[in-house]
């Protein structure tokens, strides 16, 4: 039986006019071999759970495959606040779409596929280091429940790629419900291709925002949806301590899914000003700046959509961003603290908690996990995470008093055991700390991919105890704290 028998393909973007893309064939790497195949995810598309040579040949661009029509998308974007018209898929190709078991279509994008007309000064390649980081982080984010692109698999080769040092060329098979970015609309606006921009908006509504089609103002409704989804994504980032590192508008998905993993980082100590991108000298994309930058990016998209949407409608949608973000962030924080009900004083509880975490350089993830285990462990386990134990005890007393006010749907008090069980499903034990990714990369560069596989599997179940992997939940060593990552990939 053919391995493709239960798989459905299409390629709607390739049916758009040529102004949107250039057809490009992948340039195969030398001696390509699997690093990882995401078998559980693959099965959701009717693909085999086990990697094989036929999948390798098709998904690494070594052999032609009829359902695929590889293309490089053209877009633009604001990078560190400056408009750059010369962007596009410089090393990635949109191969096709594949149907998920729930009926959703996912793009198949091959990253590291070679030169395209949009490669500029690049070589069209990706290296093993950055490919592993994106594979692991997209799986970690999915495990946490944060909106994200996914990874179907990755391959490595013997092809040398020259960065700060000579590295091995690799490819990532990235999956996303769309690869349409804010920058697609910006490109068409700034080049005055307004008919094409309207066509793209029509197709985006048809493919992704069907409910907007029947709205009185479909394009305004579409933009409103993009604002809401972006706010939701940022709320998750801030609640889970994720710093993206390079929030350019060409890295912003219209569906509010975390996109393009480069110099990202999860918080170790709670540090609002954390900068994970080695090249972000001004701290534009620091952790605490992410909500502001998301709104800035949405404003840039609003400007680009001004031929389609009236100014007051754009302003109305943008005005909803902060309220939606605050609402979603508060919901997530209440969940992390095991609070089902909502009272006015919760804001002060949150603020004093963040102040305490910041002043004491407390590990963000371990704090919430320790708080989740108060039914099993003494409160001292939480107190000991702080330098100022007296202040920590005072906050914990306030928190526990607040928990006493919690009741369930029928007005009965919620037990500590019930609350802790729910909190353990919200506060991860395991996150992708940069030092863990680096250890996996170091082994992989020596030809041992076992740590990549182990780490990916741990991160797919971040809320589970997994006692055999306790070492992966430890504090990072000194060399692994607050790592800044280069953009060179």
From Swiss-Prot:
Keyword Nucleotidyltransferase: yes
Binding site for Mg(2+): 251, 260
Coiled coil (residue ranges): none
Molecular-function GO terms, alphabetical: AMPylase activity; ATP binding; magnesium ion binding
Binding site for ATP: 88, 90-91, 111, 123-124, 174, 181, 260
Highest taxon in the source lineage: Bacteria
Catalytic reaction(s) noted: L-seryl-[protein] + ATP = 3-O-(5'-adenylyl)-L-seryl-[protein] + diphosphate; L-threonyl-[protein] + ATP = 3-O-(5'-adenylyl)-L-threonyl-[protein] + diphosphate; L-tyrosyl-[protein] + ATP = O-(5'-adenylyl)-L-tyrosyl-[protein] + diphosphate; L-histidyl-[protein] + UTP = N(tele)-(5'-uridylyl)-L-histidyl-[protein] + diphosphate
Active site: 250 (proton acceptor)
EC number: 2.7.7.-, 2.7.7.108
Keyword Transmembrane: no
InterPro entries: SelO
Keyword vocabulary terms for this entry: ATP-binding, Magnesium, Manganese, Metal-binding, Nucleotide-binding, Nucleotidyltransferase, Transferase
Cofactor: Mg(2+); Mn(2+)
Enzyme type, top EC level: transferase
Entry similarity comment: Belongs to the SELO family.
Its biological purpose: Nucleotidyltransferase involved in the post-translational modification of proteins. It can catalyze the addition of adenosine monophosphate (AMP) or uridine monophosphate (UMP) to a protein, resulting in modifications known as AMPylation and UMPylation.
Name of the protein in its database record: Protein nucleotidyltransferase YdiU
Organism from which the protein derives: Vibrio parahaemolyticus serotype O3:K6 (strain RIMD 2210633)
């Amino acid at each position: 039986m053919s391995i493709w028998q239960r798989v459905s393909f299409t390629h709607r973007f390739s049916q758009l006019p040529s102004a949107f893309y250039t057809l490009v064939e992948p340039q195969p790497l030398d001696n390509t071999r699997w690093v990882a195949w995401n078998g559980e995810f693959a099965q959701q598309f009717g693909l085999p759970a086990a990697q094989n040579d036929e999948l390798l040949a098709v998904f690494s661009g070594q052999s032609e495959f009829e359902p695929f029509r590889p293309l490089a998308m053209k877009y633009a974007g604001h990078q560190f606040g400056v408009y750059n018209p010369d962007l596009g898929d410089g090393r990635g190709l949109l191969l096709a779409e594949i149907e998920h078991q729930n009926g959703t279509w996912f793009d198949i994008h091959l990253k590291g596929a070679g030169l395209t007309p949009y490669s500029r000064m690049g070589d069209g390649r990706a290296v093993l280091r950055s490919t592993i980081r994106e594979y692991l982080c997209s799986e970690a984010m999915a495990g946490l429940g944060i909106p994200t692109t996914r990874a179907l698999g990755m391959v490595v080769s013997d092809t040398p790629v020259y960065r700060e040092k000579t590295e091995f060329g690799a490819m990532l098979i990235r999956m996303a419900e769309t690869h349409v970015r804010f920058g697609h609309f910006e490109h068409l606006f700034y080049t005055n291709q307004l008919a094409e921009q309207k066509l793209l908006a029509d197709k985006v509504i048809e493919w992704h925002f069907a409910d907007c089609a029947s709205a009185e103002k479909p394009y305004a409704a579409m933009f409103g949806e993009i604002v809401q989804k972006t706010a939701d994504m940022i709320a998750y980032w801030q609640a889970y301590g994720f710093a993206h590192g390079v929030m350019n508008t060409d890295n912003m998905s219209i569906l509010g899914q975390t996109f393009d993993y480069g110099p990202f980082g999860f918080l170790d100590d709670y540090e609002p000003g954390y900068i994970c991108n080695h090249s972000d000298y001004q701290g534009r994309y620091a952790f605490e700046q992410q909500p502001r930058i998301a709104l800035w990016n949405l404003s840039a998209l609003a400007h680009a959509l001004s031929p389609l949407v009236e100014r007051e409608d754009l302003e109305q949608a943008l005005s909803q961003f902060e309220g939606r973000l605050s609402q979603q962030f508060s919901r997530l924080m209440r969940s992390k603290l095991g609070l089902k009900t909502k009272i006015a004083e919760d804001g002060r509880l949150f603020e004093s908690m963040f102040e305490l975490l910041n002043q004491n350089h407390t590990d963000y993830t371990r704090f919430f996990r320790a708080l989740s285990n108060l039914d099993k462990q003494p409160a001292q386990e939480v107190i000991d995470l702080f330098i100022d134990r007296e202040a920590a005890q005072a906050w914990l007393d306030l928190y526990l008093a607040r928990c006493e006010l919690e009741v369930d749907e029928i007005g009965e008090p919620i037990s500590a055991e019930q609350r802790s069980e729910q909190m353990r499903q919200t506060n991860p034990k395991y996150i992708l700390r940069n030092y863990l990714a680096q250890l996996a990369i170091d082994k992989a560069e020596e030809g041992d991919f076992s740590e990549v596989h182990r780490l990916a599997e741990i991160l797919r179940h971040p809320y589970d105890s997994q006692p055999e992997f306790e070492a992966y939940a430890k504090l990072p060593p000194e060399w692994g704290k607050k790592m800044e990552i280069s953009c060179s990939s």
